[in-house]
From Swiss-Prot:
Its EC number is 2.7.8.26. It catalyses: alpha-ribazole + adenosylcob(III)inamide-GDP = adenosylcob(III)alamin + GMP + H(+); alpha-ribazole 5'-phosphate + adenosylcob(III)inamide-GDP = adenosylcob(III)alamin 5'-phosphate + GMP + H(+). Keywords: Cell membrane, Cobalamin biosynthesis, Magnesium, Membrane, Transferase, Transmembrane, Transmembrane helix. GO terms for molecular function: adenosylcobinamide-GDP ribazoletransferase activity; cobalamin 5'-phosphate synthase activity. This is Adenosylcobinamide-GDP ribazoletransferase. It comes from Mycobacterium avium (strain 104). Pathway: Cofactor biosynthesis; adenosylcobalamin biosynthesis; adenosylcobalamin from cob(II)yrinate a,c-diamide: step 7/7. The gene is cobS.
């Protein structure tokens, strides 16, 4: 278990991990990925809260700095998946052509637009959540939800896209019991994410639903999941969860 956890942190962050204590990304590391999400969520929440202290509750800078911190510590791994997946989905061609577009090193207009929307939406939502609560648990929950979405995307019956090494390593690797357990943990944590107990669960379920729809569409479009698809699902789920929660706390 510790080896899988170290592998998950090595994959999902820039934190140094002993080479002998980690292995290749696979089933165990994917199962442990939500733990990385908890750590990243705590970091984002702390930065967003610090931003409200320094710049005031009405400033969006705290949320923007929280997103910047996440991008730095994850080396932009998942946001790159957003860009590549958006470009692939915007390609009018057969699956092999769409996969080739995703593997291309350049970023097209769809990718640029998707990244801008995701970064700005997360930044503004994180700022709103940090301003509305003494402790911005909602920020941490949204980031955590994104990594739970990755586990759901790797559940049994979900295939890997042709040519994707990461997809081949993790697609179909997560039993339903593991996915259900992480969703249960997420829902439990989300109960304290908003002023009312139902705010958090509604927000994260909406986020997970959007992530699942994206994954399903990508499976049809690309023939399966890849590392880029997982990154896009993570970021979409986190973004929708944060935006939905920011809206619900005002109800």
């Amino acid at each position: 278990m510790m080896r899988s956890l170290a592998t998950a942190f090595a994959f999902g962050t820039v934190l140094p991990m002993p080479a002998g204590g980690r292995g290749p990304m696979g089933r165990g590391a994917m199962t442990a990925l939500p733990v990385v999400g908890l750590a990243l969520g705590a970091l984002a929440a702390a930065v967003a809260w610090g931003g409200t202290v320094v710049f005031g509750r009405s400033s969006p800078l705290g949320g923007l700095l929280a997103v910047a911190a996440l991008l730095l510590i994850t080396r932009g791994l998942h946001i790159d998946g957003v860009a590549d997946t958006a470009d692939g989905l915007g390609c009018y061609g057969p699956p092999d052509r769409a996969r080739a577009v995703m593997r291309d090193g350049s970023t097209g207009p769809f990718g640029v637009a998707a990244v801008v929307v995701v970064v700005m939406a997360q930044a503004l939502a994180f700022s709103a959540l940090a301003a509305g609560r003494p402790v911005p648990v909602g920020v941490a929950v949204a980031v955590f939800a994104g990594r739970v979405a990755a586990v759901l995307a790797c559940r049994r019956t979900v295939p890997a896209a042709a040519g994707s090494s990461l997809g081949a390593a993790v697609a179909g690797s997560q039993p339903a019991t593991v996915a259900a357990a992480w969703v249960a943990v997420l829902l439990g944590m989300s109960l304290v994410a908003g002023p009312r107990p139902w705010h958090g669960p509604v927000a994260v379920l909406l986020g997970l639903g959007c992530g699942a729809v994206l994954v399903r569409h990508c499976v049809r479009r690309f023939g399966g999941i890849s590392g880029d698809v997982l990154g896009a699902a993570i970021e979409l789920t986190a973004t929708v969860s944060a935006v939905a929660l920011a809206a619900l706390v005002r109800v």
